[in-house]
Each structure stands twice: as structure tokens, then as C-alpha cells.
Swiss-Prot record:
Keywords associated with the record: Aminoacyl-tRNA synthetase, ATP-binding, Cytoplasm, Ligase, Metal-binding, Nucleotide-binding, Protein biosynthesis, Zinc
Lineage, highest ranks first: Bacteria, Bacillati, Bacillota, Bacilli, Lactobacillales
A Pfam family this chain is assigned to: DALR_2
Name listed for the protein in its UniProt record: Cysteine--tRNA ligase
Encoding gene per record: cysS
Motif annotated as 'KMSKS' region, chain positions: 267-271
Signal sequence residues: none
Species in which this protein is naturally found: Lactococcus lactis subsp. cremoris (strain MG1363)
Subcellular localization(s) per the UniProt record: Cytoplasm
Substrates-to-products reaction catalysed: tRNA(Cys) + L-cysteine + ATP = L-cysteinyl-tRNA(Cys) + AMP + diphosphate
């Protein structure tokens, strides 16, 4: 199995620290609003990675955090005249509601930043003791000049990174030894949530939170760290700098970053205002369709969010569901053909989780199933791929029985040449969204 490591910009053989086990950390949302489709792309992309690793036999310890203390949370809470805790808990609940509908497997743990404040203070104190950090008027900053290969993850020089970074780097430069230095701790401002530290009251900076939560729960070196491509700098760059300064160990063995969701060629983001929240979208779009849209493009490629793309996803799901519902798990099949499908799917996915190539194999498999191939092993592989994709087809047994009874009644009508009755039953089923297909092997049905 190979993973594209952002740090080296190369495909690398995957060798976990402990054979058979994977320690994985993915940056979660800052919970001041509902997640948008761009956020969901990251959640779904790494859910697919996790599920495929489990399919391949790995035991995955999967950690994804909630940033529940942040400038944006403080501002949003103040605008509603509520506490930051009340605001963040609201949007944590909404996150679970949305991602459950998208069939995202719950993380092994979802730590909150506010649960690790003491550990963050200890982490910062150690950086101060090692002279990697300094105090300036109650703030604590990291000395970037002491960090070896600081800009390597983003594959740019430091000047370019600072010029292209987001507003997260717009800190009080007059308090810093160098404009490149970043905040580990921000001193308290009036009426803001704060905690007491040896250097004064305040709250942690954004970057320190993920370093502390990941190393506290997974150890000093982890196998895989994931997130959106926009996190390469400054967030992940700064995580590496502070973590390796503290521990003296390599922080992450494989860095993975998913591509953006674009609207009219621009990255979907709250700051641009061109975002659609998942909460809103799921009022009008089936969660399965959104999940399929987000899942079936290779995770590193950008996605263009359009109505046509959602329609294509819907049509493809219908084809897959139709094959799945008519798969006869008692049928006989050529198991060597099944083995070929399985091996080809694994070969595609083993190349940096290339689901786009994997889907090409899977669509061929679906066509093969539609030719009458079935059996328990065929159904088992079908189920495994659906699990990786995060797609579930609910089998409505009572409705299926009713439909089968009507089909049988129609067949009897045809045998006695009562075509008016036959057409009446066909029309009644069509009104329920059920389409009949008369084939040489009998009648089949599927939902429109």
C-alpha cells in the first residue's frame, strides 16, 4: 500500500509504527457554525481512508478534534450574548447530526481543546524551558528561527508562506521577535474566556491545540495526520515545529491533505461567503447522494460543487442500488471473476486510496452482477465496497413483499391475456415509483 506524503511530495510505502495498527489524527472543525460542504469533504475523505484501512485488516485508532476555543467562537458567542461553551456545544451536536446522516463512522475519540488546557500549559512551559518560545507582554510566541526545515511541509520558502497565509497569522507583530513567530498563548482580553498560566491569564493559540491533543492521545509520533490542503500552512507547519521542538522526535510519518470543494472555481469557505452548510443542504438533498458525490473523487483532487454533479451522483447510486437489490445471494457465479474484481479494486485503492480508479472496477462489477451473477461471496464483496463508500441500502422487506405480490398478480393476468389488468398493475406500481422490466429471465423491478 502506498500513500502520497505531502511532506515528501512522493508516494511512499505505508509502514505503520506498530504492525497491524494505525494511529491517525485528523483536524476537526472549529465549532462556531454548521459545517459547510468543503468541511464535509475532509470528514468524508478521511472516513473513506479509515474504512479502507480497516477493510485491509488494520486496527485504526482514529482521533479527530473539536476546536472549541477560538477568536471566531468568541465573536459568534458575543454576538448572541451566550457563552462560548453553549455555542460550541450547539455546533458539536449539529456536527454529529450531519455526519451521522452522511454515514461517517464516529471517531475513536473526539477531544475538545478546552479539555486539554493544563496539558497545553505544560507543553508551552517545556518550549519556554528549551528556549523555543518566549513571553511578550503576556503572550507566548514560538521562535520559528530555531525550527529546522520549518517550511518544508508547504514546499515553499518562508517569505512566500507568510505572504500567502490566511488571517490566522495576523498577530501583533510589534510583540514578536520575528514576523514569522506564531502565538502559543494569547493573553486575556476584557470579557473573554481565559485560563490561568504561570505567565498570565489567557487562552491557547490555535496550533498548540492539535499538537497537544494528538500527542496526548496517540503518542509523540503518529502514523497519519490528515486535513484540508489549506491547513498545510500555517497550521500543520506550526504543529510540526512545536511538536518536534518539544519531543525531539518526528511528529508524523505520513501527512495527507484533501483537495478543496470549489464553487465557480473558488474554494468553498465561510470567509468567502460562497458556502452551503451541510445542515441546509440535507433538507433538500438525500444524504446518500451528497456522501457519494464527496466520496467518489480521489481525495487530493478538487471537487466542483454543482447541481449536475449531484444529479450524476444520484443516477450512479440508483444503478448500484438496482443491482444490489436484485443480487441473488443463492446464485452460482464464476468465483475467479469475483477474485479478479476484488484484486483490481484493492490494487486501485492501495495506490493512495484512489477511489476514482476503484469505482471504475466497481462499476464493471455492478454490470457483471446485473448479468445474473450472484452468490454469498459476491454479496459479501458488494457489502464491503458499500461500507468503504459509506453507502447503505435499507432493505424494505414489507414493501418488497407487496411489490412481489403485485408482480405475481400481473404475471397471472398476462398468462390469461388480461392485458388491461396487467397494464393497470404496471401503472399502479409506476405511481409508487416502481418500474418493471420484462426480461428473458422474468420480471425485475427498480425504483425510479
Amino acid at each position: 500500500m502506498k500513500i502520497y506524503n505531502t511532506y515528501s511530495r512522493q508516494l511512499e510505502d505505508f509502514q505503520p509504527i506498530e504492525p497491524g495498527k494505525v494511529k491517525m489524527y485528523v483536524c476537526g472543525p472549529t465549532v462556531y457554525n454548521y459545517i459547510h460542504v468543503g468541511n464535509a469533504r475532509s470528514v468524508v475523505a478521511f472516513d473513506l481512508v479509515r474504512k479502507y484501512l480497516e477493510f485491509r485488516g488494520f486496527e485504526v485508532e482514529y482521533i479527530s478534534n473539536f476546536t472549541d476555543v477560538d477568536d471566531k467562537i468568541i465573536k459568534a458567542a458575543a454576538s448572541e450574548n451566550i457563552s462560548t461553551k453553549e455555542l460550541s456545544e450547539r455546533y458539536i451536536a449539529a456536527f454529529y447530526e450531519d455526519t451521522d446522516l452522511l454515514n461517517v463512522k464516529r471517531a475513536s475519540q473526539n477531544p475538545k481543546a478546552t479539555e486539554f488546557i493544563e496539558a497545553m500549559i505544560d507543553f508551552i512551559q517545556e518550549l519556554l524551558d528549551k528556549d523555543y518560545a518566549y513571553i511578550s507582554e503576556g503572550d507566548v510566541y514560538f521562535r520559528v528561527a530555531k525550527s529546522k526545515d520549518y517550511a518544508k511541509l508547504a514546499n515553499k520558502n518562508l517569505a512566500d508562506l507568510l505572504a500567502g497565509a490566511s488571517g490566522r497569522t495576523d498577530e501583533e507583530t510589534n510583540l514578536k521577535e520575528s514576523p514569522a513567530d506564531f502565538a502559543l498563548w494569547k493573553s486575556v482580553k476584557a470579557d473573554e474566556v481565559s485560563w490561568q498560566a504561570p505567565w498570565g491569564a489567557g487562552r491557547p493559540g490555535w496550533h498548540i491545540e492539535c499538537s497537544v491533543m494528538s500527542t496526548s492521545l496517540l503518542g509523540e509520533t503518529i502514523d497519519i495526520h490528515g486535513g484540508g490542503a489549506d491547513l498545510e500552512f500555517p497550521h500543520h507547519t506550526n504543529e510540526i515545529a512545536q511538536s518536534e521542538a518539544k519531543t525531539g522526535q518526528k511528529f508524523v510519518n505520513y501527512w495527507m491533505h484533501n483537495g478543496f470543494v470549489n464553487v465557480d472555481g473558488e474554494k468553498m469557505s465561510k470567509s468567502l461567503g460562497n458556502f452551503t452548510t451541510v445542515h441546509e443542504l440535507l433538507q433538500v438533498v438525500d444524504p446518500q447522494i451528497l456522501r457519494f458525490f464527496l466520496t467518489t473523487t480521489h481525495y487530493r483532487r478538487p471537487l466542483n460543487f454543482t447541481d449536475d454533479a449531484l444529479t450524476e451522483a444520484e443516477n450512479n447510486i440508483k444503478k448500484i442500488e438496482n443491482a444490489y437489490r436484485h443480487l441473488d445471494d443463492q446464485a452460482e457465479s464464476n468465483l475467479s471473476a469475483l477474485t479478479t474484481f476484488r484484486n483490481d479494486f484493492v490494487a486501485a485503492m492501495d495506490e493512495d486510496f484512489n477511489i476514482a480508479n476503484g469505482m471504475t472496477v466497481f462499476y464493471d462489477f455492478v454490470s457483471w452482477v446485473n448479468k445474473g451473477n450472484g452468490g454469498a461471496e459476491v454479496k459479501a464483496f458488494f457489502d464491503q465496497v458499500l461500507e468503504i463508500l459509506g453507502i447503505k441500502f435499507e432493505i424494505e422487506q414489507s414493501l418488497d413483499s407487496e411489490i412481489e405480490a403485485m408482480i405475481e398478480e400481473r404475471q397471472l393476468a398476462r398468462e390469461v391475456r388480461d392485458f388491461a389488468k396487467s397494464d393497470e398493475i404496471r401503472d399502479a406500481l409506476k405511481a409508487q415509483g416502481i418500474v418493471l422490466e420484462d426480461t428473458k429471465d422474468g420480471v425485475r423491478w427498480h425504483r425510479e
